[in-house]
Amino acid sequence: MEVEMEFAGRLKKIRIKLIMIGICLIFLGGYSLIQEWKDQKKNTTKKVFDQYTDAFFKENISTNEITMHFFLENPEKYRLEQPKNLYPSMNQGSILNEKIKISKEIEKLKKFKQKELTKKQQNTYMVLMDYLRRQKNLSMYPYYERILGKTSGQQAQILLTLSEYRLKNEKDIKSYFQLLKGLDGYFDSLIEYSKEQVKRNLFLSDQSLKEVLQQIQNVIKQKENNMLVATFNLRIADIKGINAAQKKKYCRENKKLIGTKVLPAYEKLYSHLQALNGNGKNENGLYYYKNGKEYYKVLVAQKTGSDKTIEEMIEISDRSIEKCLRKLIKLQKKYPNIINEYRNHKKI
């Protein structure tokens, strides 16, 4: 009897152990399934994030012809089609759409859990989020941007951009000609933007406008010695696969388009801007516009990518300049003729 009871007790213990082992196996199996599901989810998140950044790049690089051509030599490798727009648009509709788009992109990005991304993806996430947030802050001041200027204005910079437009084949030449033909439309958006600035008391000072008008006038006067003629002739000379006769034909067409499309576009821009003379309410800097101080802070943060205050940046700049001056003084003491030798391009 005692033996039977002892045997039964052992069986009971064995059953309990087996049940515990079974529970552990179920738990471990469930845990591994959960872990596998989590790993799959992480891999899916990584894949979706790569798809998102790829789409973001393609969409932003192909907004207009001049931007895409500047950044990509072979856009077909990215399966990008020819952009519908030739130039960036500065009209009211596009400005509003850009503001909405930035907010949507931020919300899309927020949906990704950073801990499920690789370190490289996390860095991309942080850089992109920082960029979008700074752009969003800047979009709150849509008509504060100085789009016109003697040298840095878009009416001046577009000449440099066109003169450096990459020409590798006939397709590039034809795209370039389309840009010349579409310059008038681009300037129309600058005119519209400037008129909106007038309404908001954000237009250029009369002195700044005078300098812009002088720059435009100088372009108009250069009918024969226009930089777009000289630079085009140099660039097309290096293109292989086009015979001499065809190159001459393209050079003549370029010169004709400058006379019939480019210069008239500048003349129209000059006329419209001249009519806005006297509307500049601020002869000082951005700070002196309504909300100018706030805009300046946002602009500096966007341009530098830093969250330091203006005062902190000035202090850092001053220290850096002072450090450079001390080094220069030491060098001049050691090499008394260093400045003259530098000016004469002699080896020190």
Model-identified regions with their sequence ranges:
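Short, Lys/Arg-enriched N-terminal segments with co-localized hydrophobic residues
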Residues: 1-4
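Hydrophobic core
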Residues: 23-27
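N-terminal maturation segment of proteins
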Residues: 7-18, 28-348
